[in-house]
UniProtKB/Swiss-Prot annotation:
InterPro entries: AAA+_ATPase, ATPase_AAA_core, Lon_bac, Lon_bac/euk-typ, Lon_lid, Lon_proteolytic, Lon_Prtase, Lon_prtase_N. The lineage of its organism: Bacteria, Pseudomonadati, Thermodesulfobacteriota, Desulfobacteria, Desulfobacterales. Keywords: ATP-binding, Cytoplasm, Hydrolase, Nucleotide-binding, Protease, Serine protease, Stress response. It catalyses: Hydrolysis of proteins in presence of ATP. Induction: By heat shock. This is Lon protease.
Amino acid sequence: MAQPKIPEYKANGTTDKLPETVPIMPLSDGVLFPKMIIPVVITQNEYMTLIDEVMSGNRLVALITPKSGERKSDYGPGDLSPIGTLALILKMAKPDESRIHLMLQGISRIRTKNFIKTDPYLEAAFAQITENEKKDKETEGLMSNISNVYQELVRISPAIPNELGAMAVTIDEPGSLADMVASTINSSTEEKQNILETLDVKLRLKKVTRQLNHQLEILKLGDKIQSQIKEDMDKQQKEFYLRKQLKAIREELGEKEEGNVEAEEYRTKIEEGNLPEEAYKAATRELERFSRMHPSSSEYTVSSTYLDWLTTLPWDKQTEDHLDIKKARAILDKDHFGLEKPKKRILEYLAVRKLNPDSKGPILCFLGPPGTGKTSLGRSIARALGREFIRISLGGVRDEAEIRGHRRTYVGALPGRIIQEIRKAGTNNPVFMLDEIDKVGADFKGDPSSALLEVLDPEQNFSFADHYLDVSFDLSRVMFVATANVIDTIPPALRDRMEVIGLRGYTLEEKVKIARQYLIPRQRKENGLAAKHISFSQSAIRHIISDYTREAGLRNAEREIASVCRGVAAKIAEGKKVSGAIKPEDLYEYLGPVRFTSETGENALTPGVVMGLAWTPVGGEILFIEATSMKGKRGLTLTGQLGDVMKESATAALSFIRAHARDYDIDEDFFDKYDFHIHVPSGAIPKDGPSAGVTMLTALVSLLTGRKVKKGLAMTGEITLRGKVMPVGGIKEKVIAAHRAGIKEVILPRPNKKDLEEIPAKVKSAMKFHFAEKMGDVLELALNGNGATKKKKKTPAKSKKSTKPAAKKTAARKSRK
């Protein structure tokens, strides 16, 4: 049977006349360009009917892309793009009743006008779009660039036949070149439709150039990735091959593999290490993983480090305690002067250990100012016990992992400082000092003080769990010793775990003895000096301690002594003559001018000025309280950087005086006309605490009655609104400070009488102590009863003018009564 003749059509002018209308076939997954040929498969019944009718006629259909790009079973006129392609069906095949295969060739771009019918398929009138094929220099440049880039794309892409590259060179029409390239490159249906709808040929060439360059970049990047993958695979294959060869060579030589050698070493350590059962299981389990790892694996090092920690910790290694009490006492006395209370407690611990070796060790916390020997006392404990000594500083530690360690999931994870230091000590019963425990911080990383609760609890620390080890370690044999400067910043729960032993500041006499017996010999040795080169007179040592340092301990005093020793050493090195004996007048040459001048009791000479006693972290101090009054109605003014507690004490003192004004012969109207100002000198230093209550009240009464405070008298104590004198702390430091300032008498709250036992006998014998229960007792002692005690009998006061704002009732006021 003869094949039917296929009509011939041209884009510009036709051999066969084009019809006025054409059936529409939506094409959702592609775009047909003029002069291009594409295959299409039809499965929908309505389009099968369309094909049957077209094949019996002119074989023309319009392929138009839907606007949304979505597949539908039924498209309306509004769903289609306005521009499509008029196509000729070249071939049709029907392999079965459900499918039709078509081969379509594009003829020209068309624009749909109006739709003639919509059922059973769409049919519309159309207009053929003709193109201006004229070429200028820019067009020729664009065509040349497209041709060159397309050639490179054909060379790289296996999806584009080489024949198309050759064809692109022969195409002379710019629009046809753009259409051919756009139809063959890998771009989306939307991008191709955009090219089809671009009627300006020059603009179409530019868009195709952009798509072409983009496609070329993608292919080049893919090529590069593929090359890298191939290179990596080749490298792995090469490494695998070489390792196989290395393994064969080692087997021939009778050698074991590197990983197997390390695994065997770890196995030996585990078996001989006498690990606890939990640690033994963890180590064995990790060793099985380790033995299966390749040495070049990143996990190999992580696993090896973990096994190192498990096998090198002193699980069962401990030092034997030296429980010779006499020898321990001798060591403590040799290393430290004084400190009787801590020494006594340490010797008690040794005695208990001697009688009951299984007793749980205490958690001692040495509390005191800097330089009082807290840290060195820990070393002496280790010497006395014959144990290893380790120390970590907790100052500024804010991360819980510093105590417990990091979990092994983190890169570079390690155990916490507790486990690290114990491994370094090589024993499971060292003396472990937690220095500056009062300075532990907390932030978003956790609270280290909470982690220390387990460490310092004898009921829990036998199974301390470090996050890195993930097994329990027994800390119950460790003797923990902590140090702190202040106790207020230690959390209550942590404070409850420890036995706090206070280390008070030294007296001047104690400092002189310590300097002569310990500090000067040590600095001579460190600076290479002999006793003949340098010695200090008693007065020179006193001068250094009192005028060049201001501290409870001796750290700065040792620095000053070291400065003098270095100065002498420099002279000797230069060949200069040195006198050897350092006197007070020689100190200026080495240390410069005096840095501190101590307050003395001679300063409190005017009404309204009273000498109080204060406690500081570096020891006691005398503190002057100054009171004055001026006309006004603002009430009470407080200056000198006073804290809330001191402000409340001042308010309570003023309220007490106002309530008892009659008792002390003070004009009640005076408080309505005058303001009061209480100032505590050294305004740059913050001050707080209840100890100045009696001092402030005495200063106000002294001011209002015009009476001076007794010369050489200081006081301390808290007051109530009822006038009761309450006990305060820091009595030892305060009394020592008073003695240093030349004060002979001190007023103390009666409940503090017991605290005199802590004061050195030499200081106590040089001073007179008064104990007060009520403010009346204080005022009687301080003002000698000169108008400041409660009246027993009313007597009219003399009326006389004064330049001071007298608060006594005037005769005129009395006459009105």
